Amino acid sequence: MIKQRTIKQSVQETGIGLHKGDKVTMTLRPAPANTGIVFRRVDLEPHADIPARAEAVGDTMLCTCITNADGVSISTVEHLASALAGLGIDNIIVEVDSDELPIMDGSASPFIFLLQSVGIEELNAPKQFIKIKKAIKVKDGDKWAELRPHDGFRVDFRIDFDHPAISQTRQHMVLDFDSSSYVDEVSRARTFGFMKDLEYMNANNLALGGSMANAVALDEYRVLNPEGLRYSDEFLKHKILDAIGDLYLGGHSIIGELVAYKTGHGLNNKLLNALLQNQACWEFVSYDNSEELPIRFASPILAN
């Protein structure tokens, strides 16, 4: 059978929180089968667990924030969730001593590195996938996102930014994860932002940790980062990275196709909730062997 996954051992990293700009220590710990993804606030006494659940997503203005039944929240979870989705990790405890995860370099790549550095372990329990049986779509003005049946996981994604530096890059792509590697194609794409917005947010005590060390910064005309872009279509690929993370807060990899136009955290979550609340549109499936499995994950990796 295709088995659930966790990590082989714990690993710790320190970084800056995007919103407060404070130092955050994060520890990733292995978890037993059927635990799911659980965020643990160790800065609180007693410690507070916040399970990743679609219905737990609250504020999505600048990032994805999830809240438990007691009202305890954790923010900026989408890049780690995206890395976990890309590596097919089902079970993990994420301890943080803050109300937000470290932003790292603004992509999923540092999380991929941490997870791979300790190795991925298979657990003796079947991995369950959410298989799309019937299309479901959500809209917000001219923005929309849809999940459709597909034997695999494919993303058909379009953005539309009227900005000189973005409009000259690719704004539409179809990525099939049967053949495309998440780690190579998507994980290194950084979040991006406009300097005028950052200045406004800083004045309102928001995004205090935001800098060119963890984002692609744009003025009215161009990219300001001296090193330029990591991918020629980094803006588009970061939006795909976000969507993969947002959809993984349902706790399971999706067998289906995401087709989206100008979607963001709020609409991604609206789509996931609409799906999970409409049982006619999906079912849980598991697979006996890798030949049947229509998604390609990295093989379980041994830590050095």
UniProtKB/Swiss-Prot annotation:
Q: What class of enzyme is it?
A: hydrolase
Q: What is its EC number?
A: 3.5.1.108
On whether DNA-binding is a keyword of this UniProt record, the answer is: no
What is the active site of this protein? H265
Annotated pathway, please? Glycolipid biosynthesis; lipid IV(A) biosynthesis; lipid IV(A) from (3R)-3-hydroxytetradecanoyl-[acyl-carrier-protein] and UDP-N-acetyl-alpha-D-glucosamine: step 2/6
Swiss-Prot/TrEMBL cofactor(s): Zn(2+)
Q: Where does Zn(2+) bind?
A: H79, H238, D242
Q: GO BP, one example?
A: lipid A biosynthetic process
InterPro entries listed in its UniProt record: Ribosomal_Su5_D2-typ_SF, UDP-acyl_GlcNac_deAcase, UDP-acyl_GlcNac_deAcase_C, UDP-acyl_N-AcGlcN_deAcase_N
- Which keywords annotate this record? Hydrolase, Lipid A biosynthesis, Lipid biosynthesis, Lipid metabolism, Metal-binding, Zinc
Molecular function as annotated in GO: metal ion binding; UDP-3-O-acyl-N-acetylglucosamine deacetylase activity
Any one GO CC term of the record: membrane
Q: Where in the sequence is the signal peptide annotated?
A: none
Does the entry feature the keyword Hydrolase, yes or no? yes
Q: Which family does it belong to?
A: Belongs to the LpxC family.
What function does the entry list?
Answer: Catalyzes the hydrolysis of UDP-3-O-myristoyl-N-acetylglucosamine to form UDP-3-O-myristoylglucosamine and acetate, the committed step in lipid A biosynthesis.
What protein name applies here? UDP-3-O-acyl-N-acetylglucosamine deacetylase
Native species? Pseudoalteromonas atlantica (strain T6c / ATCC BAA-1087)
